[in-house]
């Protein structure tokens, strides 16, 4: 029976112990979180005026990598946007960056103004470019819903896991030898699998490291486009859709006798 116990949680971070599921399923969830969660990101940039020292292309790249808040509950799904089922105007928004310098000025992500109040830069203090007196930039930027499988600017979160280590201490001296690497050798959250193996090498036979089958320490960190709760719900929705599509195709092939 699958079980999950939360070790640490905040709005943008979650660490949990997962057990009772095969590694293939845990890895599938990890891959979906990294590459298939939909988020808004600037995809097209129209440079109306740029007298700064930075090339238009560099500005466009920086704008594309600024994370934007993404209200999934009020947006069409990525599938609807990608297939043209949804109204294209609902799958994106327009942002404007217009700054004229009266002196030495740093232009920040917070200077971007959006036509949608719910799609704005997550962090207002990301520097874009420096201007001196008399320089100006006027840019129209168009954001749209996308996934990191197409480009890294659409990555919403990162995720990873490691096998739940089982440390067997044969010589109590190992605790002293390893106290800087792993102060608590028997705590799998504080002493990761790799750290435990480092301790094993240092102890030279005084410690064994095994792992528990189908038990892992799993963590997710959101980049701020939405919270980790939303990220996980969306990841499971995507996984469920994939499983349903696979099952449907499998039944279809079996019914028709195809190989």
UniProtKB/Swiss-Prot annotation:
Catalytic function, reaction form: RNA(n) + a ribonucleoside 5'-triphosphate = RNA(n+1) + diphosphate
Protein's UniProt keywords contain Nucleotidyltransferase: yes
Keywords: Cytoplasm, DNA-directed RNA polymerase, Nucleotidyltransferase, Transcription, Transferase
Localization in the cell: Cytoplasm
EC code: 2.7.7.6
Enzyme class: transferase
Domain of life: Archaea
Gene Ontology molecular function, alphabetical: DNA binding; DNA-directed RNA polymerase activity; iron-sulfur cluster binding; protein dimerization activity
Record-level GO cellular component terms: cytoplasm; DNA-directed RNA polymerase complex
A Pfam family matched in the record: RNA_pol_L
A GO BP entry: DNA-templated transcription
Protein family membership: Belongs to the archaeal Rpo3/eukaryotic RPB3 RNA polymerase subunit family.
Matching PANTHER family: DNA-DIRECTED RNA POLYMERASE, DNA-DIRECTED RNA POLYMERASE II SUBUNIT RPB3
Subunit-level organization: Part of the RNA polymerase complex.
Biological function: DNA-dependent RNA polymerase (RNAP) catalyzes the transcription of DNA into RNA using the four ribonucleoside triphosphates as substrates.
Protein name stated in the entry: DNA-directed RNA polymerase subunit Rpo3
Encoding gene, per UniProt annotation: rpo3
